[in-house]
């Protein structure tokens, strides 16, 4: 089949990311592109955060079905094994990004109808709540700080599935036993391959927070005696 060229939306996202990579032009701590799963775009987003050194990219991943085909229709249920393999084959290695899976069901505010959204949509709420009730260096996960504004996860998970996702540095989102209607993030890994404190989101965000505060102090002292 002949190539149709790059997706126009991917090209636009990459152009925007090139602007965001400039610290002098923009300021932010978290980067999210809900529903953007293209490897070319997500790789560029990771590079942008690494170049800035003061932001974490929270990413959605490519979903594969049970037949190992890339899912284009959100109604198709993901095949966990093939999704993990697809992600692992990218061999991403960075402490400036974190991946979540799967999509979740939320209520549309206008009419309370259920809608399926990428995991990053729910995780932005988790991160915001974590920072409001605690601090960026607390883990945005678990029963205390990891609850999403959602009522169902697209994939039902047992312990084996949870472990497989976590071993692949994919943070699982699921409904724990006995908590029907409640969805939680149960992982806070970055994509750093080596065992290190920086393989955890809260540690990377702590260092980002320190770096930003030191920068602000330095700016205030600039040109002072």
Where are the predicted features?
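Structured, hydrophobic secondary-structure cores that serve as assembly/anchoring elements
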Residues: 11-225
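Long, low-complexity, polar/charged, intrinsically disordered or flexibly structured peripheral segments
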Residues: 1-10
């Amino acid at each position: 089949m002949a190539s149709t060229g790059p997706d126009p939306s991917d090209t636009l996202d990459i152009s925007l990311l090139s602007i965001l990579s400039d610290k002098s032009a923009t300021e932010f701590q978290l980067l999210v592109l809900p529903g953007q799963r293209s490897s070319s775009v997500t790789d560029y987003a990771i590079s942008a955060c690494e170049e800035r050194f003061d932001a974490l990219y929270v990413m959605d991943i490519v979903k594969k079905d049970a037949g190992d085909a890339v899912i284009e229709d959100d109604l198709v249920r993901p095949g966990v094994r093939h999704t993990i393999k697809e992600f692992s084959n990218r061999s991403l290695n960075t402490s400036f990004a974190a991946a979540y899976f799967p999509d979740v069901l939320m209520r549309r505010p206008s009419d309370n109808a259920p809608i399926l959204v990428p995991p990053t949509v729910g995780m932005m709420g988790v991160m915001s709540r974590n920072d409001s009730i605690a601090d960026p260096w607390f883990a945005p996960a678990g029963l205390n700080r990891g609850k999403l504004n959602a009522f169902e996860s697209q994939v039902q998970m047992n312990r084996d599935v949870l472990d497989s996702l976590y071993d692949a540095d994919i943070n699982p989102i699921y409904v724990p036993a006995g908590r029907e209607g409640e969805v939680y993030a149960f992982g806070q890994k970055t994509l750093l391959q080596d065992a290190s404190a920086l393989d955890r989101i809260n540690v990377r965000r702590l260092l980002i927070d320190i770096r930003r505060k030191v920068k602000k102090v330095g700016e205030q002292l600039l040109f002072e005696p």
